[in-house]
A protein has these predicted regions:
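Short alpha-helical
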Residues: 12, 76, 107
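Glycine-rich nucleotide phosphate-binding loop and flanking beta-alpha elements
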Residues: 14, 74, 120
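Short loop/turn motifs at secondary-structure junctions
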Residues: 1, 26-28, 62-63, 91, ...
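Left-handed beta-helix
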Residues: 98, 103-104, 109-110, 114-116, ...
Length: 134
């Protein structure tokens, strides 16, 4: 059974990551979350949107994982939201495109994106919360 994830964010990058996870991963995206102050709609990409402040009531940490979908323009915010999700106890998932070239010895953290046409060579260690895009 595929693992279920919630995407943190409601941006064009969030929509792109929803598409990528849906089409190219074994994860099932079940919804989105955003900080209460940014709640504008109850759905995004046809899925429910939940206030982050209430997220663990709807999507408990033992049943769901998370992906923080904040792009390049708000890298500081991405780090803050990553830390908030970790503080609530969520495991954060990576997205690795099936069209990327990844070596078997890759050591990788959490909440990373490796898009298509990216080539990660031998002896590489990647930390948390990075985006690799060509």
């Amino acid at each position: 059974m595929p693992e279920k994830i919630v995407i943190y964010g409601l941006s064009a990058f969030s929509e792109m990551m929803y598409y990528n996870f849906t089409k190219y991963s074994d994860y099932t995206v079940v919804g989105f979350c955003v900080d209460q102050e940014y709640m504008k709609d109850e759905s995004f990409c046809g899925l429910p949107v939940v206030a982050f402040e209430e997220i663990e009531e709807v999507y408990p940490t033992h049943d769901y994982k998370m992906f923080v979908a904040i792009g390049f323009s708000r890298m500081r915010n991405r780090a803050l939201l990553f830390n908030k999700a970790k503080a609530k106890g969520y495991s954060l998932v990576n997205f690795i495109s099936p069209h990327a070239i990844i070596r078997d010895d890759l050591i990788i953290g959490e909440n990373n994106v490796i898009q298509s046409s990216v080539d990660i060579d031998l002896f590489v260690t990647i930390g948390d919360n990075n985006v690799f895009w060509t």
